[in-house]
């Protein structure tokens, strides 16, 4: 809801470097034009990235239930930025909703099949809403020393057909042509009209708060 293109988060680190370089000295008009010319493109490496959502057990008999840890296996991301600018040209993420699946070993294989079926069909309605997307609208960058940057990324998160503005704190490391972004944030299930799963005649149900975490690797193309 892996919420999970996420490689975009990492790009803000490069924006910070570009802004610092621009502030460091005057540039001629021709040089400025060259800086604003070609956009740098980074694409998410899904095989090396992780995007998970934790749902917590609640209700009067919450102690009889288990938390859920749902991971996405299919997601794509791309970020484009203009060197020397503090605003990327585009920053997007798309997660295939049907790829989200329970990962906790506390559940049996058969239980996971039931959970995943309910998640896909009733909770996310993946056939009707096949993608969960994030599109950036604003970003602020704070260098944290060395190749580490702390970023606040604002954008539109669309889940189950509902779009909400969401601010995500991210720690980004930039080394060579590779960007790595890590972070976590909370969303409310009710904000996106996501129904709660329940057991024991409704005495155990998923809480409203969901925690989204990610560890994203992206490479410059």
Regions from the language model: what does each represent?
Residues 21-221:
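Low-complexity, acidic/polar, glycine-enriched regions of mature
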Residues 1-5:
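Positively charged n-region of N-terminal signal peptides that target proteins for export
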Residues 7-17:
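Bacterial N-terminal signal peptides
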